[in-house]
């Protein structure tokens, strides 16, 4: 297949990434990829009602709660409308201030008080309006009331809670509805299948049905004690006859001279062995006794005209009567409904000459007597008895009235206030049971319960199959909007109860709507959810990919979900319905494996919470461009071909027969029968997995590790996009929110390190839209202490389109995701230093800061008001010399840009202490020499021991009402200057445009301006006076006035925004009680690569750096180029991640093609430009780009080729990577050996290695498992209180313990005294270790060992088991024991 290039049309701009040479042949649904966090945003918008056709979740909650009437009906509180305000601060200001990014919610309430004549406990007599005959209104009060603040979503799909960016993870849970299941024969040793059914509501009580080993059907409510299902049916109002008639068909038996005449029904004879001859009504024998009748035979008999047959009189014995049967007089009961007909009953039928009976259609083969048997367990139970039995199980110990019990039972399943199936549950119930109940009815009905029981009985009879609970048709996704809606509902219900309580005690004459509402109630509920819910998580902000993945994560854990301890293998496993919906690769490796997963790349979630996957429609063997999204339930009905199916130029299948997916299986069908085809081979994987080139060549376990480790990659000092990508890099970068995207198209007006100013302009309409000013984030700290830094890509004069990348973020290069570096790798062993996945690195890599990363550490100093007086920030800290304060300013706060190291003071602070009494001689010396006596102690903020770096930012927050220090005033002034600059930028752009427009209008009009020529007037008059020109032409004046209005409006808008920002800045800061000031210092720490750091490729090939080798000792190529990294070749075969080898070859070709292009450029002339053009045609062997290359000007061609010097960027999309032959062709084109191997020379002795080595370029990542964060040493530190042994871990400043296996080692060497020391004085012998410390100080080498504390702990535990253990100190006793 010939390669193609994406994007197809290349426009040479400085901010464009170089197009990748791609081998993909499938189409991409660009619309699905432009917004990777659509699921988060759409869910939240549906809740608040933004951009939705349906009503918002907030409005529905308010309408379900209101109106609220007081208990006596004297007044009512009605809901009118609601409004959502604007946030007080933007998201970055909220992070800076440590507050929640939220919007105020206000509702308009109407309080109506009725005129009443008389009020009693029983009733209220209202004053009735004579005209309308309705209750008269005493007065109406309407008011807008605040009910609290709602945390709002940022444009990036996150929430900022108390200054921390958080993500609400979507949850996979069992969909509301009915589910049928079996125990798969595991409950009883006989292996008998026990069937059950469960009705799960969205909110309310669960209803279970289950058979037991005796085939009696029971039910449970909320997993309480089980009861016979006949009790539930009677509680629903059904009598015994009703129950039998509902669940069983009747068969009519008519008596004649020869026996009973019975209708012939084909299904009743299927597979039946006749106990007697089958005789028609005329006495003809149709089938002999002991014959097994097949379905075909039964149908033939029916077709031959058999409608009735004869049964001998005695054969009705054992059948079940359908109705109560009375004698002809109607007084005596012969047989009760449901009873088994016995010989005695047959005699009675003869005696009373009964001509016709009806029996139940129970044949014990296709229809069993399960309901009948259950009914006979408690045949004489009445409706009231059934209700009492159910109530007794659910509310034991109570004895209420019958009315109370009825109300309680109705509330369980039939009232909206306590039970809610939700729309999804009703749809699932209708679909499962074949009902046609309206979706608005979200409570259970009597028919629902009866149909569930019927289907469960059919399952027991062998008809149908149980549900697969892991099928995605039975699992749905709850996203952020649904979670917040549920919490909002809880808060509003609490508010409702409070309002009703208040109504019962308030004087209505003086009450206003605001008196009823306490805004703290809703705020408390929402705060608890966002702060402590298992699904509200601290956002993984290590790099842009980790952010995107976290927002697209699906968790089966959390409230209402599974627990990792009880989750079995089935729920964790990959299911066929996950195809195109949930990634089968990306999941954690630990105990959460399979419970946490990621949404597939093209998947979307519909309004009911079910995951849909896109497919291209196939019409009579021709693949169309129409894309349809299918649910897992719908997909099983169609034949779906794989995206790799070969198509001709007319998009028709080449092969007559194709493998297709159908109902969870792979089948071979004709091409005309195919309904759909996959849109892309990569639609089955997640975003992270789609970034792995040659994924199809890797083992699944290693692909899982590769997906997970990309999320752990640390952004490097200089981002470098991979030479070998997959084509997804730019899409992930744009969707991550890390880059800056142009809101509107326009022309770049000004660019600097902090701002990009764009004059928004619509080229098609030739219309000016305004000014967009973009603030760039500089050296800000992420949640994981990585550095967020945005760099502009555009330059003044560039034209940008909407959604163009105009500034890179961290780990972004030219708008493409860049998590690591392209480095030269050799696969070989080297002196044993790359044993067991260890990695050998060249010192040149460290020297050039290839893998150096910047981390921002935050340190906080809090100034409090103490009982002895306020703490103070000051430079003159007691007992600190001047040299240690040199990097502090006059206030006592470190300067930005200062180089600080361990132990340096960042903020000088003193805390008052109680005054101390000085002796007289000291007082005299103080008086004589004028020395200060400090009544305070040093409480400064010091830099921790393991940190060294540069101060990049300082924030000072002073409590409102407290006098600000000079540093905080300076910081505030700098912020104001930034606002002024931003305002001036906007005004400059607006002024430039409108003055140009005004000049164009005046010049084109050709009129005299103030009796002067237009050009002369404009040159001699200041621009601000141009508006005051005197003209006689009314048309021109009208145009000028319109321009003036727009100009003044935009200028006024710029000043208004500036004033708002200044007001917010001057408002001050709300700090916690007792806090006067908070100083935050941000230190940038540079982490160079060093032994112990963890590195990885994208194929799960991880390792730890074992040694940094001098560059002169590293193996080198024939041209003298030393390799950067040496990997162990034994790490490939057993791991089966061959993708890294293919990436190495592909990268080797890419870089050498770039070198060849660079060589042509170095010797460029008119002849070689043609040669360069032809060579690029060969490299980009695709028609789309070939046309562009041939049509490029020489200047553009040279600029394009110049950007290929470092290597030709290539894409190996998932499951569509280049074949071996294509890689070989590129190696040949680059004048390389097609084996991909080269001769290497030993850098230490200069000799060539015995055989060729695989060398090439691979994309390596530095992971956030840095040795600086892990290495730890301790001499003295904290001990455990009970065992008196050192604590464990770096966070506790712990140490290592001498454990059981270490004791074995000393025992093996017979080192008894060393072992005694290790277990006593060097460990937890409290007295002994103090004594040995004293002896060391004294220079004495003698010591005694005591009893270790761990032995005392063991003795205490034995005593707790009532074993009295005592130690005897008698030396004579010990010697006698030894002698014995």
Curated annotation (Swiss-Prot):
Keyword Repeat in record: no
Pfam family, one: RNA_pol_Rpb2_1
Disulfide bridge partners, by residue number: none
Keyword Transferase: yes
Molecular function per GO: DNA binding; DNA-directed RNA polymerase activity; ribonucleoside binding
A cellular-component GO term for this protein: DNA-directed RNA polymerase complex
InterPro entries assigned: DNA-dir_RNA_pol_bsu_ext_1_sf (IPR042107), DNA-dir_RNA_pol_bsu_external_1 (IPR019462), DNA-dir_RNA_pol_su2 (IPR015712), DNA-dir_RNAP_su2_dom (IPR007120), DNA-dir_RNAP_su2_hyb_sf (IPR037033), RNA_pol_bsu_bac (IPR010243), RNA_pol_bsu_CS (IPR007121), RNA_pol_bsu_protrusion (IPR007644)
GO biological process: DNA-templated transcription
Entry protein name: DNA-directed RNA polymerase subunit beta
Organism classification: Bacteria, Pseudomonadati, Pseudomonadota, Alphaproteobacteria, Rickettsiales
Gene of this entry: rpoB
